[in-house]
């Protein structure tokens, strides 16, 4: 499940944006830059949240609870090359094994480069409280001089388990909130972000039949100080079937990305749509299909 979350959360990007040369470009250079910047910000915040969940899911229940005594241990996140070179530590602070508390730090130091060429610097700090997947348990993620490819990330992401069900299928739901989020680019311009989403993972009988549903909205200001809202109008559906085929975008769902007073509709696919990386963009009474780069 952790690998699924890694792939899917990165795929939440709005559309990171290059059109084919033979397509009519309905989006201005400025609008395209705004959409691209928002895509980067969305991706980096979701990845940071995923890294925190990955780290939280790695220790044993006894290590999370601290055993009989509190202390600090170093943990290793297996199978995820994004953690290459990072030092991950777990410090427990609570004294109730049924309601454990502690802090996980993911320290990339002065810079670590993963096999895909992504450079991460600084520290992700994950404070947790409660047993994994138990309703009410949560992780609170903050940052200490954290950067991805030169883009600084700030803010607080809180992930709270809202429900756990075994019928009609095994599923876990989370409430995800971003508060005072900010991405700072190399020219010191920023994108701000506040967001509230609900995430639900529904596990199928086979690895390729698991789905991930995302609802909610994000809002803030662009690098040019224009207000924006990204509202999911029809739940975004991610499928492991599609991920395994190399398609990281949602296979279904719609969103409205409003930049200032300009509404931009995004359609990722209707119910039962085939796996692809095509987004239908609606703008100024016209539509255009854009193929997204993974």
Whereabouts are the PLM-identified features?
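Sec-dependent signal peptide recognition
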Residues: 2-10
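C-terminal motif of bacterial Sec signal peptides marking the signal peptidase cleavage site
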Residues: 15-18
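Low-complexity, intrinsically disordered segments exposed to solvent
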Residues: 21-294
């Amino acid at each position: 499940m952790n690998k699924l979350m890694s792939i899917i959360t990165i795929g939440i990007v709005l559309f990171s944006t290059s059109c084919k040369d033979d397509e009519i470009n309905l989006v201005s250079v400025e609008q395209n830059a705004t959409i691209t910047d928002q895509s980067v910000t969305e991706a980096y915040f979701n990845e940071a949240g995923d890294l925190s969940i990955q780290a939280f899911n790695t220790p044993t229940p006894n290590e999370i609870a601290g055993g009989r005594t509190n202390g600090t241990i170093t943990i290793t996140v297996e199978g995820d090359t994004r953690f290459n070179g990072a030092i991950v530590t777990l410090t427990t602070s609570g004294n109730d094994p049924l309601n454990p508390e502690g802090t996980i730090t993911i320290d990339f130091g002065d810079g670590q480069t993963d096999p895909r060429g992504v450079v991460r610097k600084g520290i992700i700090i994950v404070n947790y409280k409660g047993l994994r997947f138990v309703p009410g348990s949560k992780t609170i993620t903050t940052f200490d001089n954290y950067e991805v490819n030169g883009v600084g990330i700030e803010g607080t992401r809180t992930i709270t388990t809202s429900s756990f069900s075994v019928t009609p299928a095994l599923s876990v739901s989370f409430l995800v909130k971003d508060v005072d989020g900010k991405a700072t680019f190399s020219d010191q311009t920023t994108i701000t972000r506040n967001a509230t989403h609900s995430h639900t993972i529904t596990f199928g009988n086979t690895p390729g039949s698991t789905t991930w549903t995302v609802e909610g909205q994000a809002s803030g200001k662009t690098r040019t100080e224009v207000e924006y809202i990204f509202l999911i109008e029809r739940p975004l559906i991610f499928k492991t079937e599609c991920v395994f085929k190399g398609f990281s975008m949602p296979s279904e769902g719609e969103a409205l990305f409003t930049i200032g007073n300009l509404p931009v509709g995004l359609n990722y696919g209707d119910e039962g749509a085939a796996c692809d990386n095509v987004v239908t963009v609606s703008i100024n009474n016209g539509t255009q299909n854009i193929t997204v780069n993974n």
